[in-house]
């Protein structure tokens, strides 16, 4: 590579870094606006104004308003998956580990996560009919582990996919109640744990019971 090509390549890298930093800054502004105002009051125009950029720039960086919400919730799901990389082997401790991580995440910024998840529901981003959508990604976090069957903790009389769906549903229903303001996070923890453990009990071996 010649000197000129090196300069051009360096310039391209620098521009991409600056673009990513600007995008991250605007993304954080969007998070704050959604947390304070909710979905209905959140607009691309106001986001652009506070960020000091043009509306077309926002569209170029993120797309539509719904795309921003989808990315926010996608990041949340990725965070949940990252938090679950080294879970306990015991199913009960695993369930507690998972639910505690969800609660701890929500506690970091209650207003934002409630607003973002409410927005996602309103925009139907959790519609199970969307191929490879948020619903399917969230379900994968709830999948039972293969070593539970290998250790004889689960009998295998119920399809793992069914257990995954029911565990995810226990978390989802509790989350919807929390987002709607019907329960607090402690009640969410209790509701989600009870639902998950009842699902596990339906296929647990006598020894595990």
Where are these regions (language model features)?
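Basic, helix-initiating cap at the start of DNA-binding domains
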Residues: 1-37, 44-50, 67
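Amphipathic alpha-helical packing segments from all-alpha helical-bundle domains
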Residues: 125-153, 158-172, 176
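Amphipathic alpha-helical segments used for helix-helix packing
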Residues: 106-128, 143, 176
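Key DNA-contact positions within bacterial/archaeal DNA-binding proteins
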Residues: 56
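HTH DNA-binding helix-turn interface
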Residues: 37-38, 59-71
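C-terminal peripheral helix-coil segments that are non-catalytic and often amphipathic
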Residues: 1-9, 104, 143-147, 170, ...
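Hydrophobic alpha-helical connector segments
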Residues: 84-111, 163-167, 189
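Short hydrophobic clusters on alpha-helical segments that form packing/core surfaces
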Residues: 26-34, 76, 102, 106
């Amino acid at each position: 590579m010649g000197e000129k090509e090196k300069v051009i390549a360096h310039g391209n890298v620098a521009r991409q870094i600056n673009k990513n930093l600007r995008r991250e800054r605007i993304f954080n502004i969007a998070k704050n606006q959604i947390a304070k105002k909710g979905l209905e009051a959140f607009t691309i125009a106001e986001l652009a104004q506070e960020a000091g950029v043009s509306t077309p720039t926002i569209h170029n960086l993120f797309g539509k308003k719904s795309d921003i919400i989808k990315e926010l919730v996608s990041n949340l799901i990725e965070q949940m998956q990252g938090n679950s990389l080294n879970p306990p082997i015991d199913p009960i401790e695993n369930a507690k580990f998972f639910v505690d991580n969800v609660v701890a995440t929500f506690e970091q910024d209650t207003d934002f996560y409630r607003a973002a998840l409410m927005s996602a529901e309103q925009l139907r981003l959790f519609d199970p009919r969307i191929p490879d959508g948020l619903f399917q990604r969230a379900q994968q976090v709830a999948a039972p582990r293969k070593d539970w069957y290998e250790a004889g903790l689960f009998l295998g009389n119920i399809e793992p996919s069914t257990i995954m769906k029911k565990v995810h549903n226990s978390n989802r229903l509790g989350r919807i109640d929390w987002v709607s303001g019907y329960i607090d996070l402690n009640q969410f923890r209790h509701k989600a744990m009870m639902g998950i453990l009842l699902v596990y009990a339906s296929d647990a071996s006598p020894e595990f019971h």
